[in-house]
């Protein structure tokens, strides 16, 4: 090749290399964004659930009931089958069962994130479909296993539970959930920023903040979705102490894998792998009946003290 042509070819190649790199990067960015954009589009195009214009009277405050409820996220895969049980007002009801049985789905139907395919979900004695969103949400406080905190202060993240609360009330609720210990550790105390998503706090500490929100809201019904399953003993103790406080004033419904934490529940609802309620009763009653709950309990007892043993 003629040296002049070779130099010209190299010069042109170098000129367009950056352009081609930018095109490749842009293509990758478009492909990466395709799935999130599709998810946002799905959310925006979701059908809005109908609701009444005005609140209705609640004949049974603090009570939750399922009456012949069946539900599936799609028609081909039903999750719940003909579920019926009542959560009495003012007590602690625990829901137990294997993973994938539909326990968290029960909570989502209580909060009306979806409507049941058949049957009726009642909160406060009234079908959730006959309540305004504001009325329904005012009765519920929810504590989930995965907690998201905003890039704001400890105080403001707790105040979300009750926007009109004073700083004093926020700190009282925080103290009951053990958040005061977190405030003492952080530079800035109660005014310290927790970072986006609460990244400056551990998972257990974020859970305490979430419980403090629920304490501050003082809702008639509290839903705990496996809130202590991944906590260390110290954080778990703080959360359980806060639940004891809430138990004095609220109806508590808790999903639990740790059966020893719900022995004192007023009622235990057992859900099997098919999404059906197979047992309802107290711990002692269910142990005596030798059913699914007893199997789970005895499996837990066999696992106590289990440890990995290294090779000699």
Where are these regions (language model features)?
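Cytosolic ends of transmembrane helices, especially the final helix of ABC transmembrane type-1 domains
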Residues: 15-43
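Primarily ABC-family ATPase nucleotide-binding module
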Residues: 44-93, 115, 127-129, 168, ...
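ABC ATPase nucleotide-binding domain
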Residues: 83, 133, 137-140, 151-152, ...
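The feature captures the beta-strand-to-loop junction immediately N-terminal to the Walker
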Residues: 96-98
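ABC-family ATPase nucleotide-binding domain "signature/switch" substructure
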Residues: 105, 138-146, 157, 173-179, ...
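Helix-to-loop junction immediately C-terminal to a conserved catalytic motif
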Residues: 111
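Conserved post-Walker A/P-loop segment of ABC ATPase nucleotide-binding domains
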Residues: 114-122, 164-165, 264-265, 280
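Conserved ABC transporter NBD signature motif
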Residues: 119-126, 136
